[in-house]
Amino acid sequence: MTILFLTMVISYFGCMKAAPMKEANVRGQGSLAYTGVRTHGTLESMNGPKAGSRGLTSLADTFEHVIEELLDEDQKVRPNEENNKDADLYTSRVMLSSQVPLEPPLLFLLEEYKNYLDAANMSMRVRRHSDPARRGELSVCDSISEWVTAADKKTAVDMSGGTVTVLEKVPVSKGQLKQYFYETKCNPMGYTKEGCRGIDKRHWNSQCRTTQSYVRALTMDSKKRIGWRFIRIDTSCVCTLTIKRGR
């Protein structure tokens, strides 16, 4: 968990360098710094462990704030939800990098870190009983998640239903970066490939199916026009049920 925390801190300061600063009056009190950021001292030195816990929570909230700013431009170009209900499926699982990312997207790490903070405030007994593995909790469908490149995807479907070519590299000021997509799909080698876990097969037909959501990526259409478009990628594995009729 220490390694995870350090990874998030490094990612956070990288975001700080890239994120645009807004007007001071938006932040309040005439400060251009992000809320919750300390310029000196350590979390442990601020009145003991309780203050450290408050500091960690504040830091986690700061991550969310930075992420909101980084995705601010994407939200401006987000499709009109009244005209396309599929816009609700928009998600951020794209990263531009010179090498394969070693961790899931920052939003996933942030959620995991918050869960860690919640667990840290529990007693050992409560924490032990809240562990899903100890409660016997299992996923209805087995899934796998991994980073893939445009070389793996090659083509995708955009929001208008057309097939576009996913560009492998994105030009930047100092060269080129590869587009990586964090995809989640049903595990073909898992125990649920023949049906969902925990479903009464006497009354239901079940199947684990991979579903998709929209992400924004650099693509080229059939007319050789290059631009940022919303495309579909695999993002989850869900269970679908149909009732069995009379035999």
Swiss-Prot record:
Residue ranges of the propeptide: 19-128
Q: Where is this site: Cleavage?
A: T57, S58
Please indicate which superkingdom the organism of origin belongs to: Eukaryota
State which residues carry a glycan (glycosylated). Answer: N121
An annotated GO cellular component of this protein is: extracellular space
User: What keywords sit in the KW lines?
Assistant: Cleavage on pair of basic residues, Disulfide bond, Glycoprotein, Growth factor, Secreted, Signal
PTM note says:
Mature BDNF is produced by proteolytic removal of the propeptide, catalyzed by a FURIN family member. In addition, the precursor form is proteolytically cleaved within the propeptide, but this is not an obligatory intermediate for the production of mature BDNF. Can be converted into mature BDNF by plasmin (PLG).
Compartments, as annotated in UniProt: Secreted
Predominant location category: secreted
Q: List the disulfide bonds.
A: C141-C208, C186-C237, C196-C239
The role this protein plays is: Important signaling molecule that activates signaling cascades downstream of NTRK2. During development, promotes the survival and differentiation of selected neuronal populations of the peripheral and central nervous systems. Participates in axonal growth, pathfinding and in the modulation of dendritic growth and morphology. Major regulator of synaptic transmission and plasticity at adult synapses in many regions of the CNS.
Instruction: Describe the family membership recorded for this protein in Swiss-Prot or TrEMBL.
Output: Belongs to the NGF-beta family.
Record PANTHER family: BRAIN-DERIVED NEUROTROPHIC FACTOR, NERVE GROWTH FACTOR NGF -RELATED
Q: What is this protein called?
A: Neurotrophic factor BDNF precursor form
Task: Tell me the organism.
Answer: Ailurus fulgens
Output the lineage of the source organism: Eukaryota, Metazoa, Chordata, Craniata, Vertebrata
By which gene is this protein encoded?
Answer: BDNF
